[in-house]
């Protein structure tokens, strides 16, 4: 027998078989992964046996003659099939099915292939992870609320702010407060005489305050972690014997977390402990000043803890600085019943770990206002008076300050005379003989801490009650401090409401609301356009000006329909695009924003404006093509827009062409995603107004305004980690080239804890210390004594040499080094934010302003711009400054949009139409009627002044308004801004400027001279002058108009391809 056949065959046996038969041609079709097939061919020179196969070795045993016809094999794994016939087939580009002549592929299969199989588009849209809004009902919490006072010190990096006083207040669960209080006493903290749970540290030594606070925080989290570990051991006494038998360990603290995961039958009820470090506006100041002393997680905690850290700086502030000490949770399992999640609750099985979390939270990020205003908004008592911090600063810098005979600081240290007299009167009422500057500073700081602690408790209880009562989530156990900002909390509430309504029965929000990712993330972000802000009049205007403002513009826009459902696959998308193109080519008919035959989507377009006499000063769209955002009436090329913008442009007379782009996204339908969320907040606000509940009103207003911003959150590929936090997974990514270390920087060593060793003295011979001559480039001086060497007196034969002190820092290099890691893949991975919702929110706001422009300018169509009357002079994102003529048109043409005449705020799906309303912002302070400014001056965007407000109803005059972004407004007046404009207009060489103190915050930076974890004080001087680099065109000496095809944007140098018919 020459060859034996079996059921399975590997490649070597197949090749051996072919070599025996020696056909004229042998084809081997091999099935690979993902449906691919490779072909290999063996050709023989002579079928009668005179030649050898191309890939065959010489063999003595051969058949007398070869086979004179080709033979084909199909290899699938170890199965080999003989192919009788091969026929060419085609592959459907939409569903990947193979067919001979024709086939029918279902929509479901096309969608599945587009979203899950196609290697190019399968990662374009990702499901959004969901976890209920609530916290575990048994969570134990401890709050350390603190404030710090600083003085100015001239350091190596400029005027740095050095803490000299820190006051902290303990609150939370009684057992944790008792534990923390005992530790504070043990570590020698001073107890404030007026409150037993308030402690302070007071010393001018440069690093002492930070070191003492660091020691306390470290000892506290160490003791809490140890307590959690001891509870874990009490519930699992068998671990000691197991550790000794399996790992040979006597002390369980020597186990690692990975060892502990392998332990048998871990049991016991899990514990969840949270330690919050809280202050007001600390993330942009106090936590940076103290950060180098307190950021430490290499503690004396038991080894089995899994320690992770979330450190995220953003815009010069610490957004996250959280440390988690985790142990396994024996009750954790995959959830199958999601009813509790729908009501915002969670329990033991939802947490992979039991933990101690140490979190830094800033109440400013939850209130967006000063401490005093926040206290008023949440109905908290606030003590009168304030502290003369300028005097305190001078006292610590110079050792004294200017005072009267009783030691009370002079008027120069106070904001104004009124503040000086008030505080002097308050002090005299105390009956003290001499003014104690530091004692008063301590009292004011402690009172601020008590107010902040009251604010913390008020925020906790008020938000929990709001989520329970207004949102209807009675199982949530909501904790507002679980998330760091009001934006993240608003987004969590929105997602919870959506999850409750949709009931997806899974751990994400379902397939109908997805997050754009990779190529689609950048494409969707390109459709997000900023707000409108520019004057169309520069100079002094001596005629009435009224300011109208859209009421809750983003909230109203959020109630409108948003895209819903997974994006259409290319086949259905092409059909939907065709419907849009047909509608857009009907130039004589306007398109309804809510036409059910037209699907929502994001497109790439070219657009050409109508005749310039049909345009106005409020263009429907803006472009970044020139490098700066400009609202323009020029032709648009290659712009990414939403379907709402298509309707707005078309209805304003623009000619649009949809460009072929594989990233074009069409959604199957519309849905009012955020309408319920906005309605809840509006209802809560109205109820608060009726009940005069200032706290509820503040919460509802903040949550209503914050949601849009969360949709527009911009992600990047960067991650900042401390060197000691470089986990093995990160190291592998760096080694593989998927992550790059973009920059590394070190914390300023002066802010770290240090120990200075006593100086050493040794006697050396002068000859031993002689400086050896060296090359010029190696020495800064030609000749001189040795380093650290002072020449001895002439009659002395030896020299006493004193070393410079040796400094030992209480930190390792990993604690001091910050790495900024950046992915080598420029594409963003997004599974958190449905960014396209932000695109449509902004598109709806552009539709609002487009309708507004119709009220004002529709009657001017066909009249050249230079011949039209002045109706509006300034446009902000949600407001418009109109003249008397513009106001009359608002009262007539736009009456249904004025709130006092019944204008609506919330979109009604049963009667779909644009829904927005305005109200006059310039109102009389005496009678509340609409008022106007008789004279105004406009210098630039966000730089204008209204002289005063006159009321036509009661005839009274009230204070005007000044807007000067970036300037110290207290130094500005209407007369000064008027002089500035007139000086520029008349060619004078006078320069105007304002100055204010500014804090430069550095957390992690690769810039030279910018050192991590420093706050330096600088004087910021800004020039006050009319608009120079305008993004509009002058129509005359005062009036401006947007760019147009006759007067294009000179910055736009982009080359585009245009085919002329």
From Swiss-Prot:
One of its GO terms (cellular component) is host cell nucleus. It is an enzyme of class 2 (transferase). GO terms for biological process: DNA-templated DNA replication; viral DNA genome replication. Heterodimer with the terminal protein; this heterodimer binds to bp 9 to 18 of the genome. Forms a complex with viral pTP, DBP and hosts NFIA and POU2F1/OCT1 for initiation of replication. HAMAP family: ADV_DPOL (MF_04055). Its EC number is 2.7.7.7. The keyword Transcription does not apply. This is DNA polymerase. InterPro entries: DNA-dir_DNA_pol_B (IPR006172), DNA-dir_DNA_pol_B_adenovir (IPR014382), DNA-dir_DNA_pol_B_CS (IPR017964), DNA-dir_DNA_pol_B_mt/vir (IPR004868), DNA/RNA_pol_sf (IPR043502), DNA_pol_palm_dom_sf (IPR023211), RNaseH-like_sf (IPR012337). It comes from Human adenovirus A serotype 12. This DNA polymerase requires a protein as a primer. Its main location: host cell. It catalyses: DNA(n) + a 2'-deoxyribonucleoside 5'-triphosphate = DNA(n+1) + diphosphate.
């Amino acid at each position: 027998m020459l060859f034996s056949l079996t059921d399975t065959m590997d490649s070597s046996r197949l090749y051996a078989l072919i070599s025996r038969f020696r056909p004229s041609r042998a084809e081997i079709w091999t099935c690979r992964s993902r449906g691919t097939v490779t072909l290999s061919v063996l050709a023989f020179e002579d079928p009668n046996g005179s030649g050898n196969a191309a890939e065959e070795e010489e063999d003595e045993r051969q058949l007398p003659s070869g086979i004179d016809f080709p033979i084909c094999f199909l290899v699938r794994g170890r199965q080999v099939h003989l192919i009788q016939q091969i026929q060419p087939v085609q592959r459907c580009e939409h569903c990947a099915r193979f067919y001979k002549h024709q086939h029918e592929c279902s929509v479901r299969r096309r969608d599945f292939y587009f979203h899950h199989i196609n290697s190019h588009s399968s990662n374009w849209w990702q499901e959004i992870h969901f976890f209920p809004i609530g916290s575990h009902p048994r969570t134990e919490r401890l709050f350390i609320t603190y404030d710090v006072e600083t003085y100015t010190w001239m350091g190596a990096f400029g005027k740095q702010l050095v803490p000299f006083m820190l006051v902290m207040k303990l609150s939370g669960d009684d057992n944790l407060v008792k534990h923390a209080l005992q530790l504070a006493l043990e570590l020698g903290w001073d107890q404030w005489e007026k409150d037993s749970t308030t402690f302070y540290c007071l010393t001018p030594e440069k690093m002492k305050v930070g070191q003492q606070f660091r020691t306390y925080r470290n000892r506290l989290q160490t003791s809490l972690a140890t307590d959690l570990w001891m509870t874990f051991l009490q519930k699992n006494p068998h671990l000691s014997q197991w550790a000794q038998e399996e790992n040979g360990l006597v002390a369980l603290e020597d186990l690692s977390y990975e060892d502990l995961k392998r332990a048998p039958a871990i049991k016991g009820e899990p514990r969840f402990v949270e330690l919050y470090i809280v202050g007001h506006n600390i993330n942009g100041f106090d936590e940076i000043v103290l950060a180098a002393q307190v950021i430490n997680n290499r503690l004396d905690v038991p080894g089995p803890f899994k320690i992770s850290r979330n450190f995220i700086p953003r815009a010069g502030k610490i957004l996250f600085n959280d440390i988690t000490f985790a142990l396994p949770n024996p009750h954790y399992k995959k959830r199958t019943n999601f009813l509790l999640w729908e009501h915002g609750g969670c329990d033991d099985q939802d947490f992979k770990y039991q933990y101690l979390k140490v979190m830094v939270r800033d109440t400013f990020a939850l209130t967006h206002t000063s401490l005093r205003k926040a206290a008023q908004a949440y109905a908290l008592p606030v003590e009168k008076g304030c502290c003369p911090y300028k005097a305190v600063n001078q006292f610590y810098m110079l050792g004294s300050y200017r005072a009267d005979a009783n030691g009370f600081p002079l008027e120069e240290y106070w904001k104004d005379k009124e503040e000086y007299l008030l505080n002097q009167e308050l002090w005299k009422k105390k009956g003290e003989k001499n003014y104690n500057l530091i004692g008063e500073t301590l009292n004011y700081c402690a009172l601020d801490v008590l107010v902040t602690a009251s604010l913390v408790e008020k925020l906790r209880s008020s938000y929990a009650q709001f989520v329970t009562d207004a949102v209807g989530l009675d199982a949530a156990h909501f904790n507002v401090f679980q998330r760091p900002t009001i934006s993240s909390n608003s987004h969590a509430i929105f997602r919870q409401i959506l999850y409750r309504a949709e009931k997806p029965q899974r751990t994400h929000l379902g397939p109908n609301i997805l997050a754009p990712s990779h190529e689609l993330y950048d494409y969707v972000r390109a459709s997000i356009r900023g707000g409108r802000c520019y004057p169309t009049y520069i100079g002094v205007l001596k005629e009435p000006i009224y300011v109208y403002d859209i009421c809750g513009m983003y909230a109203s826009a959020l109630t409108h329909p948003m895209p819903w459902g997974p994006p259409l696959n290319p086949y259905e998308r092409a059909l939907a695009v065709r419907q849009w193109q047909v509608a857009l080519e009907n130039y004589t008919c306007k398109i309804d924003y809510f036409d059910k035959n037209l699907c929502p989507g994001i497109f790439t377009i070219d657009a050409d404006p109508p005749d310039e006499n049909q345009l106005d000063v409020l263009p429907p769209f803006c472009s970044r093509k020139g490098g700066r955002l400009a609202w323009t009436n020029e032709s648009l090329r290659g712009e990414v827009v939403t379907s709402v913008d298509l309707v707005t442009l078309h209805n304003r007379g623009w000619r649009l062409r949809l460009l072929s782009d594989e990233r074009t996204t069409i959604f199957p339908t519309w849905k009012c995603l955020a309408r319920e969320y906005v309605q809840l907040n509006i209802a809560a606000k109205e109820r608060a107004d009726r009940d005069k509940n200032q706290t509820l009103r503040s919460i509802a207003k903040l949550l209503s305004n914050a949601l849009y911003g969360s949709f527009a959150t911009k992600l990047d590929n960067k991650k900042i980690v401390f060197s000691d936090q470089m986990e093995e997974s990160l190291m592998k990514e760096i080694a593989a080239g998927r992550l790059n270390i973009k920059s590394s920087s070190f914390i300023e060593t002066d802010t770290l804890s240090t120990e200075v060793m006593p100086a050493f003295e040794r006697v050396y011979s002068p000859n031993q210390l002689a400086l050896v001559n060296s090359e010029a480039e190696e020495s800064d001086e030609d000749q001189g004594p040795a380093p650290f060497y002072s020449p001895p007196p002439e009659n002395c034969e030896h020299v006493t040499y004193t070393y410079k002190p040796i400094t030992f820092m209480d930190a390792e290099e990993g604690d001091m080094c910050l790495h900024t890691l950046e992915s080598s893949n420029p594409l963003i991975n997004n599974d958190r934010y449905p960014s396209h919702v932000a695109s449509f929110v902004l598109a709806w706001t552009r539709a609002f302003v487009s309708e507004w422009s119709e009220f004002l300018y529709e009657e001017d169509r066909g009249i050249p711009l230079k011949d039209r009357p002045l109706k509006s002079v300034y446009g902000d994102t949600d407001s418009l400054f109109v003249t008397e003529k513009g106001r009359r048109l608002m009262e007539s043409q736009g009456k249904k949009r004025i709130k006092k005449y019944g204008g609506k705020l919330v979109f009604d799906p049963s009667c779909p139409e644009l829904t927005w309303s305005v109200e006059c912002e310039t109102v009389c302070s005496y009678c509340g009627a609409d008022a106007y400014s008789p004279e105004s001056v406009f210098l630039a965007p966000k730089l204008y002044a209204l002289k005063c407000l006159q009321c036509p109803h009661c005839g009274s005059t009230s204070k005007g308004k000044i807007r000067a972004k970036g300037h110290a407004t207290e130094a500005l007046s209407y007369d000064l801004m008027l002089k500035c404009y007139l000086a520029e207009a008349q060619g004078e060489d006078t320069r105007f400027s304002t100055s204010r103190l500014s804090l430069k915050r550095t957390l992690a930076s690769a810039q030279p001279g910018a050192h991590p974890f420093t706050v330096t004080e600088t004087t910021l001087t800004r020039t006050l002058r009319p608009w120079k680099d305008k993004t509009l065109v002058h129509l005359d000496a005062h009036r401006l108009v947007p760019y147009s095809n006759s007067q294009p944007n000179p910055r736009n140098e982009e080359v585009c391809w245009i085919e002329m018919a």
